[in-house]
Amino acid sequence: MKGPQLDYADLSWSDNGAPISNAYGDIYFSKESGPEETDYVFLTGNRLRERFSNAPPGSLFTIAETGFGSGLNFLMAWALWRECGPADGHLHFTSVEFCPLAREDLVRCHQAWPQLAEFARQLRAQYPAPMQGVHRCRFVDQGVTLTLYLGDVVDWLSDCSFKADAWFLDGFSPKQNPEMWSESLFPLIASHAAQGCTVATFSAAGFIRRGLKEHGFNVSKAPGFGYKRDMTVGVFQAEEPNQPAALPHKEAVVIGSGLSGANVAYALATRGWKVTVLEAADRIAPEASGNPQGALYIKPGVEWSINTRIHANAFLYAERFYSEIANLPTPIWNPCGVLQLAHNDKEAVRQQKFFQHNRYPDEVIRPFTHQEASELAGVSLPASAMYLPGGGWLIPPQLCAHMLQHPNIEVRLNSPVTALERTDEGGWLIHIGSGESAQELECAILILATANNQAMQPAAASALPLKPIRGQVTTLQVESAALPQLNTVLCGEGYLMPPIADRLVTGATFKPNCADAQVTEADNNANLEQLLQLTPALRDELSKHPPTLQGRASVRSALPDYLPAIGPLIPGQGGKGLLIVTAMGSKGLALAPLAGELVADMLEGTPAPIEDSLVQRVLPNRFSQE
């Protein structure tokens, strides 16, 4: 059996309450002086108080770490950033952990540091499931991002692109953990170091100092903490400076106010960018993102394939993201879980193979019997199911409107883009409207984030093999006597949402290569029949109390590999200022938050929310390379 699940760290606890790794025979931190040691070795060793205090307004600082463990180093860096870093700056902390701590062990560790309690609480709220790969956690109102890779350190650094301003070399001692402290580690650290990057580690082992020195670090010994005689500090001085290109002026224009556009605008705005959003219609999210309810779910493949990895990563980030930003007085996010029914023999066999061949954490996905699924849903169901506890439903247009209310975002409605023109300076001139109302807007960074805008796109976008997909959802106005007390989202051939007041939303039809957005009675009836296939017990009630049906049709776009297009539209530096986010298909609620993060990371040079090998599979130019 394979699949993405990792084993939790096997711990025991010393008499004074310090966690000990049974696999490595070493402690995670000293119960008496853990924060003090972190402050001395990593914060002072990298001169972070001085550097944070002197950082200019709006600046970005990236810290990379080996050995996340209990998160102590991250929490201490976060606390220091909030104390003396620029209020409008952004701290990006990236780390790796091969054996993640179980949540209950994390809680026990954090109880030792009451001074970090509020930061620790926020970390635990977004702490990821033990699944291999990259996990993104955003603490938006803190100006802090955590990008945590669960897996092997060499695998991580061989498949990501960033330049750190400071390195924390932590983890268990080299004697107990020689696999991590291998010779292959040091060139990877150097390749992920900005000019002037500092490094600090508790160890003064000769091979560590030599490895760092051989790959561009000026290293020296420093007095160690407590009983340790020495530690190592250093500064990176590459023979050929490998600094990333300077950040652009932090202003951008986004075309489109649906899920893709709103998420891109929000990701940039929360990093201090000024964003203008152009929307052709007179309202936000006028197309598919305007549906009255939408489900957050994915359908993972039997194999741990590229598509499954991307969708799983996006789903897990979306779950954390919505839980953080959509906690409003009138909730727009309901994390009620999703049941994917084995609605026919083919799907039943597929689900059986899935669970036979894969290990997933129960908190991500697990099998439910027919009886278990019915008890959870609150209605009688016809089949067993896959259960996604982190799924749920949202109100997409309200979600888009909420994100676009950020003070760094200006939304211009009734602003149809008619043409794009390259300027002599390498930017873009946007032509808006026509006749007397025509306007022009110039920008250096432009992101196209609509499903159907080929008419105004450059030739490179028109060359994308996008196909339209028509979908119609149906809202049923149901008498209270017939309204099911549905507790969770149901998926099969279609989906059914838990009711809002006296309304049920179900859908959606799926018609590839059809761009007709007219509502049809036939599609409403098809959606009703799909609903009754999901919940046959409703047939009698709805026949006694016939519902009123109201449809809403829209057109999405997709690509042949059913992955989105995210990133520079024109490869190379010449196309750096023009990006596209499109082809979300029917998974916009799962994919769009990750897409927004990825675009922001591409523009700022920060660690991406997925591995580089996966980034390559969503770049728009992947079809021109085939």
Curated annotation (Swiss-Prot):
Q: Where is this region: tRNA (mnm(5)s(2)U34)-methyltransferase?
A: 1-237
Residues that span the membrane, as ranges: none
The superkingdom listed in its UniProt entry is Bacteria
Q: Could you give a GO molecular-function term held by this entry?
A: tRNA (5-methylaminomethyl-2-thiouridylate)(34)-methyltransferase activity
**What catalytic activity is recorded?**
5-aminomethyl-2-thiouridine(34) in tRNA + S-adenosyl-L-methionine = 5-methylaminomethyl-2-thiouridine(34) in tRNA + S-adenosyl-L-homocysteine + H(+)
User: HAMAP family from the xrefs?
Assistant: MnmC
The answer to whether the entry has keyword Oxidoreductase is: yes
Q: What is this protein called?
A: tRNA 5-methylaminomethyl-2-thiouridine biosynthesis bifunctional protein MnmC
User: Which subcellular locations apply to this protein?
Assistant: Cytoplasm
Q: Where is region (FAD-dependent cmnm(5)s(2)U34 oxidoreductase) located?
A: 255-626
